[in-house]
Amino acid sequence: KSTLLFALSGIDGVDGGKIVFDGKDLSEFGETELSDIRRTKMGLIFQQPTMLKSLNILDNIILPSIRGNRKNIAKVSEKARTLLKRVGIAELETRDTTQVSGGQLQRAGICRALMSSPKIIFGDEPTGALNSKSAHEIMDIFSEINADGTAIMLVTHDAKVAARTERILFMLDGKIVSELKLPKLNGSDIERRVEEVTAKMLEVGI
């Protein structure tokens, strides 16, 4: 599943077929161009956000945006602070990455992914290392981001996470074996959705 996500984002190449993003075949671009596309139009969030321990939370968030161009550092920092406030960790901007919880670090990772106002966010098990409360809060943030018009694609093994989405592809041994479409989430029906996703997972042998 992670391999598919890396292919869709252009990190890994593919042996056949085409991956079309924003109307363009990614295989037609070189690594420099693909890197620019990921930096400006895609956001990537992983199970364990990669942060530099030598920098504080704010500096880690703005680093990709100012690499090679520090002229707009004030504007970039202002945007980062707005995002930190949005995800509820504005007070942590000067903290070292070792001084925050896993959930707080993941929120910082989301801020970093949003700095370029991406068209799509890819999440590779973004809640996998979090407790249930933090995972629920992270999914709430994803729901808000999606409502603002950003597409989100997640890789997860958690039925509770999958049940918060509207389209689920079930993969087994590298192949899509089933699909489930759900209506827009209504908070009151989450338990039924989890049951439906779990039943489908059992049906296909996941």
What is each stretch, according to the model?
Residues 121-124:
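Catalytic Walker B motif of ABC-type/P-loop ATPase nucleotide-binding domains
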Residues 55-63:
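Short coil-to-helix segment of the ABC ATPase nucleotide-binding domain corresponding to the Q-loop/switch region
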Residues 96-100, 104-106:
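Conserved ABC ATPase signature
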